[in-house]
Each structure stands twice: as structure tokens, then as C-alpha cells.
């Protein structure tokens, strides 16, 4: 899956999970600071990403995923 395809899928999941507009979801967008996610939202988002991409994101890795771009990079690395 290309980086662009991963970004589009992540963007779709983020807009649905956080009830934000797709235009607000950019690679540099912070889940908490820019998109208004709280800690529960973040956990639910990680679970949705795991399910959508059929991957497992350990807690240690999830703590380092703070932006949309971080999520895309992590998923890209897991699929490589």
C-alpha cells in the first residue's frame, strides 16, 4: 500500500473517530493539540488503526504516535 493510500485511510479513520473535517487532518496534525483528542480518543483511534490495517501497535509504540504522520509512518514500516 502506498504512503498516499495509507494517509487517505488514516485520514478517513481519524475524521470518523474524532468527528473532525477531513481538511483538518494533515500529516503534521497532532491528535491532541490540533484535533482535540483526549486520552480515551487516542486509545480508540489506535484500536481502529490496528483493526483497519490488521496490525498490532504495542503501548510503547502507541505513545510515540502523536501525529497523523507518525501513524502513517508506523503503518508503512509495519507493512514493509
Curated annotation (Swiss-Prot):
Pathway as given in its UniProt record: Lipid metabolism; fatty acid biosynthesis
Modification after translation (UniProt): 4'-phosphopantetheine is transferred from CoA to a specific serine of apo-ACP by AcpS. This modification is essential for activity because fatty acids are bound in thioester linkage to the sulfhydryl of the prosthetic group.
Primary localization: cytoplasm
Occurrences of domain Carrier (ranges): 4-79
GO CC annotations on file: cytosol; membrane
One record GO biological process: lipid A biosynthetic process
PROSITE patterns (alphabetical): CARRIER, PHOSPHOPANTETHEINE
Database matches in SUPFAM superfamilies: ACP-like
Gene3D superfamilies on file: ACP-like (1.10.1200.10)
Molecular-function annotations in GO: acyl binding; acyl carrier activity
Pfam families: PP-binding
Residues in the signal sequence: none
InterPro entries: ACP, ACP-like_sf, PP-bd_ACP, Ppantetheine_attach_site
PTM sites of type O-(pantetheine 4'-phosphoryl)serine: 39
Protein keywords: Cytoplasm, Fatty acid biosynthesis, Fatty acid metabolism, Lipid biosynthesis, Lipid metabolism, Phosphopantetheine, Phosphoprotein
Compartments (UniProt record): Cytoplasm
Role this protein plays: Carrier of the growing fatty acid chain in fatty acid biosynthesis.
HAMAP family listed in its UniProt record: Acyl_carrier
Family: Belongs to the acyl carrier protein (ACP) family.
The protein's name: Acyl carrier protein
Source organism (scientific name): Prochlorococcus marinus (strain MIT 9313)
Highest classification ranks of the organism: Bacteria, Bacillati, Cyanobacteriota, Cyanophyceae, Synechococcales
